[in-house]
């Protein structure tokens, strides 16, 4: 059985990046929540 995590910078950015978050209402809520908590990094 292969490992489930096969790292790829491109896929990481597309799925969890700032622009991916910004594109949906839920994603914007995630960013807002992370800003409210004072997170240094908002997204991948």
Swiss-Prot record:
Q: List the molecular function annotations (GO) for this entry.
A: structural constituent of ribosome
A GO BP entry is: translation
Keywords on record:
Ribonucleoprotein, Ribosomal protein
Q: Which Pfam families match?
A: Ribosomal_L34
Spans of biased composition, class Basic residues? 10-19, 31-44
**UniProt xrefs under Gene3D superfamilies:** 1.10.287.3980
* GO CC terms in record: ribonucleoprotein complex; ribosome
InterPro entries the UniProt entry points to? Ribosomal_bL34, Ribosomal_bL34_CS
Q: What is the name listed in the Swiss-Prot or TrEMBL entry for this protein?
A: Large ribosomal subunit protein bL34
Taxonomic source organism: Afipia carboxidovorans (strain ATCC 49405 / DSM 1227 / KCTC 32145 / OM5) (Oligotropha carboxidovorans)
